[in-house]
Amino acid sequence: YFPKFFHPDPSVKRQSGFLKPEINNSNILGSSFTLPYFKTISHNKDLTITPTWFDSDTLMSSFEYRKVEKNSKLITDIGYVSGYKSSSTKKKKNISHLFLNYNLDLNLENYISSDLEFSLERVSNDTYLKVFDPHITKSILRPKNFDNLNNSFKIFLNHNDFNFESGFKSFENLQISKGSDRYQYILPYYNFDKNIDQDYFGGKINFNSNGNNDLSSTNDLKSSVVNNLTYNSLDYVSNFGLKNNFNFVFQNLNSI
């Protein structure tokens, strides 16, 4: 008996089942066989279990969990590799990764939208992502750069009168060996936009302010605040049919 395969997609009813298996070959890892299994937990929760067997006696297990609520969405991907032997050390070890993305609608009163976002990227080995590239998740959690990991906590507020974004970010450069120097922290940062006047002498006046504290290379701290006051004229058409406009920008820069 061989289990029936299901391929979940929006056009079919959600149901548990095996997904399409894969066979791969790598100069580093050798041949491998992957057999994903999709598990429906409830109407708003599901899990994809993805074991991969390598002919080098290495086993990789990945678990991607998804949960959607009325005002929130969570997706996590956890991977664990047992029995991996590095070509440099020739010793077997266990390595892992954790990726996470969480979105929450704060539903604040008097705001068009108010959202919170948290994302996390962690690995236990600097070359893990490159070595196991074909077996790393293809979802939105997949790191965009295998040399740099990004982590962030952000808040977005959209109001009729202004837009505001703030939070913190951290970056880890996997190519730098010194532990403290490989990290960069933006803590905090902000960006504020406000339309002051929509009809001022035939144009619009907008105010923008943004700033951050940037800590890198262990103790290199830089702080900056930039304020911009912008005037944008409305378009006007000349007698020759040419459309024209102009703008002025007044900028105040403060940095340490």
Task: Please report, for each region that a protein language model flagged, where it lies by residue.
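Outer-membrane beta-barrel proteins and related beta-barrel translocases across Gram-negative bacteria
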Residues: 1-256
